Amino acid sequence: MAQLGAVVAVASSFFCASLFSAVHKIEEGHIGVYYRGGALLTSTSGPGFHLMLPFITSYKSVQTTLQTDEVKNVPCGTSGGVMIYFDRIEVVNFLVPNAVYDIVKNYTADYDKALIFNKIHHELNQFCSVHTLQEVYIELFDQIDENLKLALQQDLTSMAPGLVIQAVRVTKPNIPEAIRRNYELMESEKTKLLIAAQKQKVVEKEAETERKKALIEAEKVAQVAEITYGQKVMEKETEKKISEIEDAAFLAREKAKADAECYTAMKIAEANKLKLTPEYLQLMKYKAIASNSKIYFGKDIPNMFMDSAGSVSKQFEGLADKLSFGLEDEPLETATKEN
């Protein structure tokens, strides 16, 4: 019985160990590949729990999501013979799930060592060998990332389709201390030169601004002067027009006044000519004698009413003719007294 119990215990232990080794788990973002007797099996498995033959079959988990491979301390010799070192080069890549079996079969599960690490060393040394330290360290440093990515992807497309390079990041290389100090001094002098150039640009810009400001101010003054001059010219022209209008109005008034006076004189002359008839003159004579308070006696008193009437009427007819032609007339009383 004791031996039977021992056999059962050993069998149970063996069964538990077999079951434990047969059950395995594949994480999300990974693909499981299987080996049996050292040979790669064609079957693969996705994320989850799976069973395999214990002690005979083994598995490896291959990541298919984005991963970053770091290549450290890569030596590089420039065309001038200076040895420099890149501390760290990061390669971001991912593996297409359908290409896992072919890549693992050709390059093992550690495919990144053969396809990425060794390729980085090779491409970087190729780049440094055809460029000077100045080009690698300063002038072409910003192109190293893109050049490495393109070179890697071009080779992987033909050697391992399904392995995609997402990005490559290269740190600044380490150069000899003496050369580094020289570059620092050079950068310092370059910075000073840039600062001086910027200051000069600022001064030139300020001078240009002042010049434009003065030009604008001068243009403003000129425009104000032009506007003022135009206003004065318009005022003078307005005054001239007003004066011409006033002169024309005065001339028209004077002309109208002269025409009215001439017309009045002509009408008066015509009225006097019509009025100075012999009968009217005889009547005026009688009125004058009647209003005279002094009467002289003599032999000629009767004749003054008879004879002098004809001569006086003739004189007044001549006077009326003179008035009709616009000549100066003598007062009626003066003509009467002279007679």
From Swiss-Prot:
PANTHER family: ERLIN (ER LIPID RAFT ASSOCIATED PROTEIN) HOMOLOG, ERLIN-2. Component of the ERLIN1/ERLIN2 complex which mediates the endoplasmic reticulum-associated degradation (ERAD) of inositol 1,4,5-trisphosphate receptors (IP3Rs) such as ITPR1. Promotes sterol-accelerated ERAD of HMGCR probably implicating an AMFR/gp78-containing ubiquitin ligase complex. Involved in regulation of cellular cholesterol homeostasis by regulation the SREBP signaling pathway. May promote ER retention of the SCAP-SREBF complex. This is Erlin-2. InterPro entries: Band_7 (IPR001107), Band_7/SPFH_dom_sf (IPR036013), Erlin1/2 (IPR033294). Ubiquitous. GO terms for molecular function: cholesterol binding; ubiquitin protein ligase binding. It is found in: Endoplasmic reticulum membrane. The modification N6-acetyllysine is found at K267. GO terms for cellular component: cytosol; endoplasmic reticulum; endoplasmic reticulum membrane; membrane raft; plasma membrane; protein-containing complex. Residues 1-3 are cytoplasmic. Forms a heteromeric complex with ERLIN1. In complex with ERLIN1, interacts with RNF170. Interacts with activated ITPR1, independently of the degree of ITPR1 polyubiquitination. Interacts with SCAP, INSIG1, SREBF1 and SREBF2 under cholesterol sufficiency conditions; indicative for an association with the SCAP-SREBP-INSIG complex. Probably part of an AMFR/gp78 and INSIG1-containing ubiquitin ligase complex involved in ERAD of HMGCR. Interacts with TMUB1; TMUB1 bridges the association with AMFR. Interacts with SYVN1 and RNF139. Interacts with TMEM259. Interacts with TMEM41B. It is linked to Spastic paraplegia 18B, autosomal recessive: A form of spastic paraplegia, a neurodegenerative disorder characterized by a slow, gradual, progressive weakness and spasticity of the lower limbs. Rate of progression and the severity of symptoms are quite variable. Initial symptoms may include difficulty with balance, weakness and stiffness in the legs, muscle spasms, and dragging the toes when walking. In some forms of the disorder, bladder symptoms (such as incontinence) may appear, or the weakness and stiffness may spread to other parts of the body. Spastic paraplegia 18A, autosomal dominant: A form of spastic paraplegia, a neurodegenerative disorder characterized by a slow, gradual, progressive weakness and spasticity of the lower limbs. Rate of progression and the severity of symptoms are quite variable. Initial symptoms may include difficulty with balance, weakness and stiffness in the legs, muscle spasms, and dragging the toes when walking. In some forms of the disorder, bladder symptoms (such as incontinence) may appear, or the weakness and stiffness may spread to other parts of the body. SPG18A is a pure form. Keywords: Acetylation, Cholesterol metabolism, Disease variant, Endoplasmic reticulum, Glycoprotein, Hereditary spastic paraplegia, Lipid metabolism, Membrane, Neurodegeneration, Signal-anchor, Steroid metabolism, Sterol metabolism, Transmembrane, Transmembrane helix. It is a single-pass type II membrane protein. The chain crosses the membrane at residues 4-24.
